[in-house]
Amino acid sequence: MPLYEKVRFTTKLQRGNRFQVSKYVRWKYKLETNQTLKVTLIVIGVWNTLQVFLARMSQDGRIVIPKTNMTLMQNREVELAGYVLNVTLEPF
């Protein structure tokens, strides 16, 4: 059963412009890997920029942030890996 409501959670940005959707969130909201999701990201502690893009989750629960969105989010001196993200997932 695909996602029908907004899901908000906090996670850490990993290396390779990815973040992990926890098993609990995937189980509770019955997230499927074949569903296209509208992802909204806010990086805590850098800029208060809001980035929105469409994505699919991989089998292991990771979502890759597009390179265009990453360049808009990050400052040239700051590497964002390890920063905390506020994530909102909603059906597309």
Segments predicted by a language model, with ranges:
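Hydrophobic beta-strand residues in large extracellular and virion-surface proteins
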Residues: 19-21, 37-41, 55-57, 63-65, ...
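Acidic (E/D-rich), amphipathic helical modules within compact regulatory domains
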Residues: 5-45
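A short beta-strand-loop micro-motif that forms or neighbors metal/cofactor-
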Residues: 30-46, 73-92
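Short, acidic Ser/Thr/Gly-rich low-complexity loop/linker segments typical of extracellular
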Residues: 10-13, 53-58
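Short beta-strand-centered segments at strand-helix junctions
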Residues: 15-29, 58-74
